[in-house]
UniProtKB/Swiss-Prot annotation:
Belongs to the CSN2 family. Residues 1-23 are annotated as: Disordered. Keywords: Cytoplasm, Developmental protein, Nucleus, Phytochrome signaling pathway, Signalosome. The gene is CSN2. It comes from the Eukaryota. The keyword Nucleotide-binding does not apply. It is found in: Cytoplasm; Nucleus. Its main location: cytoplasm. One of its GO terms (biological process) is protein catabolic process. Component of the COP9 signalosome complex (CSN), a complex involved in various cellular and developmental processes such as photomorphogenesis and auxin and jasmonate responses. The CSN complex is an essential regulator of the ubiquitin (Ubl) conjugation pathway by mediating the deneddylation of the cullin subunits of SCF-type E3 ligase complexes, leading to decrease the Ubl ligase activity of SCF. It is involved in repression of photomorphogenesis in darkness by regulating the activity of COP1-containing Ubl ligase complexes. InterPro entries: 26S_Proteasome/COP9_Components, PCI_dom, WH_DNA-bd_sf. This is COP9 signalosome complex subunit 2.
Length: 439
């Protein structure tokens, strides 16, 4: 006859086996349901609901089943049911599943919903608010921070800047000490917040705030940020310098942005390489960016090839070829609003280089001849010559009667053109005064 101890052992063994069998049944039910997701979504939903019911208490399989349920309801366009399932799923994150696993799953669902519902702002708002509330209750600060960042990025992508203000304040507050100063120990998080704010100021062209934040971001030394974040900060810095006509500083920032994006495997590297080429030409640099080892692998990239040819024509001072490349590569060059914004500056630089080279052997040269060589109207040639004389880059003056540039006698030339320039300014001022009085 078995002892009490033997009976107890037998009982425990029987109990363990029963639990294992139950776990196997739940697992089988989960995978059978998952197999029907694509072909029979309604049947899959019933199966996943059964998985949740089969678990005696909240655990992994129920969490996984609810995650699948959320995705199916979303695909079916049943957003009310989706939110109900998602809200139930979030009750598991306090203790039923590990923090790392719950973070991974929630991130996965957020990416899934955000990627498909960017136009459904009402759903996104409810979805993220539900997530944030659950994360606050679970005291998961790290995922709360990441979720708010994701929400900010969604609003940024669809131009909802006002919606971002409150979230950014909360994010910034979470990176501060009790005295209200920035906590340098949270340098990486601070940079992520700064990167979003910097993008807003770049888009809204608020250069004053952009400059302040840009310098604050570069001053943070305690962080090891993701290269994508530094790519964003440097790209926006480059655009800021371009707006201020600081071509050299812009080129430095675009190069840093390119390197960071390249390290992160981000496609923005191609755009920043284009911007680097643009800044290099505007600063009249003789250095070809594609000669460096970092940019060399992209020299023959289809998106970059037009810029490669453009800088080659620029360095050879071939204005007609330069303009031909611009016209025949509208999609890769001129369709970018940022590049297009500086094209007049760039064309003026190229024409200036060609003009200076053209007039070098002559003491007297006809404006019609220059016009033909530069492929621009004579009035544009005259304007360009006047600006170069006033800037002391050409030693000479214009004989407007005979349509010649006469080199030498720069003093009289500059005095004459300064007087004409002053006269033009006074005429504009007089015209404005008369208009304002009449109106």
């Amino acid at each position: 006859m078995a002892s009490d101890a033997d009976m107890e052992d037998y009982g425990f063994e029987y109990s363990d086996e029963e639990q294992e069998e139950q776990d196997v049944d739940i697992e089988n039910q989960y995978y059978n349901s998952k197999g029907m997701v694509e072909t029979e979504p309604e049947e899959a939903l019933s199966g996943f609901a059964e998985v949740v019911q089969m678990e005696p208490e909240k655990a992994d399989w129920g969490f996984k089943a609810l995650k699948q349920t959320v995705k199916i309801y979303y695909r079916l366009g049943k957003y009310k049911e989706m939110m109900e399932a998602y809200t139930e799923m979030l009750t598991y994150i306090k203790s039923a599943v590990t923090r790392n696993y719950s973070e991974k799953c929630i991130n996965n669902i957020m990416d899934f919903v955000s990627g498909s519902a960017s136009q459904n702002t009402g759903l996104l708002q409810e979805f993220y608010q539900t997530t944030l509330k659950a994360l606050e209750e679970a005291k998961n600060e790290r995922l709360w921070f990441k979720t708010n960042l994701k929400l900010c990025n969604i609003w940024f992508d669809i131009g909802e800047y006002r919606r971002m203000t409150k979230i950014l304040k909360e994010l910034h507050k979470s990176c501060q000490k009790e005295d209200g100063t920035d906590d340098q120990k949270k340098g990486s998080q601070l940079l992520e917040v700064y990167a979003i704010e910097i993008q807003i100021y770049t888009e809204t062209k608020d250069n004053k705030k952009l400059k302040q934040l840009y310098h604050k971001a570069l001053a943070i030394k305690s962080a090891i940020p993701h290269p994508r974040i530094m790519g964003i900060i440097r790209e926006c810095g480059g655009k800021m310098h371009m707006a201020e006509r600081q071509w050299e500083e812009a080129a430095t920032d675009f190069f840093e942005a390119f390197k960071n994006y390249d390290e992160a495997g981000n496609q923005r590297r191609i755009q920043c390489l284009k911007y680097l080429v643009l800044a290099n030409m505007l600063m009249e640099s003789e250095v070809n960016p594609f000669d460096g080892q970092e940019a060399k692998p992209y020299k023959n990239d289809p998106e970059i090839l037009a810029m490669t040819n453009l800088i080659a024509a620029y360095q050879r001072n071939e204005i007609i070829e330069f303009e031909r490349i611009l016209k025949s590569n509208r999609r890769t060059i001129m369709d970018d609003p940022f590049i297009r914004n500086y094209m007049e500056d760039l064309l003026k630089k190229v024409r200036t280089q060609v003009l200076l080279k053209l007039i070098k052997p002559y003491t007297k040269i006809g404006i019609p001849f220059i016009s033909k060589e530069l492929n621009v109207p004579e009035t544009d040639v005259t304007e360009l010559l006047v600006s170069l004389i006033l800037d002391s880059r050409i030693d000479g003056h214009i004989d407007e009667m005979n349509r010649y540039l006469l080199r030498g006698d720069s003093g009289n030339g500059r005095k004459l053109h300064k007087a004409v320039d002053k006269w033009n300014s006074q005429l504009k001022s007089l015209s404005s005064n008369i208009t304002s009085r009449v109106c």
